[in-house]
Curated annotation (Swiss-Prot):
Subunit (UniProt): Component of the RNA polymerase II (Pol II) complex consisting of 12 subunits.
Keyword DNA-binding: no
Entry annotated with the keyword Metal-binding: no
Lineage of producing organism: Eukaryota, Metazoa, Ecdysozoa, Arthropoda, Hexapoda
Main location: nucleus
UniProt-recorded name of the protein: DNA-directed RNA polymerase II subunit RPB11
InterPro entries membership: RBP11, RBP11-like, RBP11-like_dimer, RNA_pol_Rpb11_13-16kDa_CS, Rpo11-like
Organism: Anopheles gambiae (African malaria mosquito)
Keywords in alphabetical order: DNA-directed RNA polymerase, Nucleus, Transcription
Gene Ontology annotations of biological process type: transcription by RNA polymerase II
Gene name linked to the record: Rpb11
Amino acid sequence: MNAPPTFESFLLYEGEKKIIKELDMKVPNAAIFTVNKEDHTLGNMIRNQLLKDPNVLFAGYKLPHPLEHKFVLRIQTTSEYSPHEAFMNAITDLLSELSLFEERFREAMKEKKEGGD
């Protein structure tokens, strides 16, 4: 089988960076972020969060190859807002939303156990 070992899908190699940022010179105020050891789950969540931001003109991601465990995220923003700021704000907002979701989920589970349903 040609599939790489399973651990390669989540362990960073020595010296490998989790996120690599490069400026996109083809369009103004754009950047390309390569996120290693992640897949559609995180890529789609970040893209959707970015699209909620009115200063983000474009946000899209792709997986270069099914056997490569990374996604490439392209972000273009308005001139007064950098792609890096948009990326960081999207991640911060996602963390807040997921924390709230976790809290509500735990409360619902607690109510379910106490209710005896």
